[in-house]
Amino acid sequence: MKMSKLSDLEGHEDRVWNVAWNPSGTILASCGGDKSIRLWGLEGGSWVCKSVLLDGHQRTVRGVSWSNCGRYLASSSFDGTTCIWRRQDDTFESCATLEGHENEVKACGWSPSGRFLATCSRDKTVWIWEVGEDEEFECASVQTCHSQDVKKVLWHPDRDELASASYDNTIRFFCEEVDDWQCYCTLDKHASTVWGLSFGPGPEPQLASCAADGSVYVWGTKGDRRSWELCGTLERHPRPVYDVSWCRTRGFLATACGDNAVRVFVKDGGDCSWRLGCTLTQAHSQDVNSVSWSPSGGLLASAGDDGYVRLWQID
C-alpha cells in the first residue's frame, strides 16, 4: 500500500499532543503545549482552522475526545482540569470544568452511551464521571488500581466498559457493578510504559496497545468477553510508540513513533497475523505523538513535537 500527504495544518505554537475526529469526520480537533485547541475543517476543498479555543486551560492541553453525538468535546490539561465544550453550529462554548485530580490530566474519553466521561492523571487515578441533566457532571467512581501515572483511557466501542493504560506497564479494564465500578481484568505482558490503546472493528473487537519499548500488542477475548489474552504482536519499532489507531472500516493499524515515523500495518491472513503495509519515514521532523483514522477510513491524521498536524491519504 502507498500513502501520501494531503495537507499540512499549521497554527500550533508548540508541540501537538493529540488529534481526534468528530463522529461524522467533518471536524478534526487538535491540542498542544500552546494551551490551545484547534478545530479544522474543509473550506473550498482545503483543510483550514475553523476555530481556536484558548480560554479553557492554563497549561498544556494533553488530550481531546468527542462524544458519540458529536455535540460535546472534552479536553484534558496539565492544569489538572478537564473542560467540556458544547458545539453550537460552528462555535464552541465551555459549559463545564471538571476538577479533582491532584496532577496533570493526561487523557479523557466519552463512553459510547454518553452517560459517562473518564479521565486519567499523573496522580495514578482514573475518574469516572456521570453525565447528568443540564450538563452537570458528578464523579461516580475514583479507581486507584494503577501504581503509576495513567497515560490513557478508552471506552469499549459498544458497551460502557473502560480500558486504561499506565506507566506501571499494565492495562486495566473496568465495568460498573451494582454499587461501584470495579477492575475486572489486568493485562501485564508489556515490559514498559503503555502509552496508547485502540479498539478494532467487529462485534467483539480486539484491542491494540503500544509501549515505550517499541512493542505493539493485539489482545482479544475468547468465549468470556471479559477474559482478555494476548493474541498478536506487531513488528517491533526502534523507538517508543506513543499512539496507535485502528481503522474501523478497513482494519488497518497506524502507529505514532518516537523515530518521527508513522507506520501502517495490515492483516496478513489470520486474525492475529500482521505485516507492515507502509512507512512514512519522516512524517514529522520530531516525535510523532498521535495518530487518528477518520471515521470513513479515508484519511489519517498525525501530530508531532514539531508543532504540525498532518493529513495523509491512501493512494
From Swiss-Prot:
Function summary: Essential component of the cytosolic iron-sulfur (Fe/S) protein assembly machinery. Required for the maturation of extramitochondrial Fe/S proteins.
Family of the protein in this entry: Belongs to the WD repeat CIA1 family.
Official protein name in the record: Probable cytosolic iron-sulfur protein assembly protein CIAO1 homolog
Gene Ontology annotations of biological process type: iron-sulfur cluster assembly; protein maturation
Pfam families listed in its UniProt record: WD40
Keyword Heme in record: no
Keyword Ligase: no
Keywords attached to this entry: Repeat, WD repeat
Natural source organism: Ixodes scapularis (Black-legged tick)
WD-type repeats, residues: 11-50, 56-95, 100-139, 145-188, 189-229, 236-275, 283-315
One Gene Ontology cellular component: cytosolic [4Fe-4S] assembly targeting complex
CDD domains: WD40
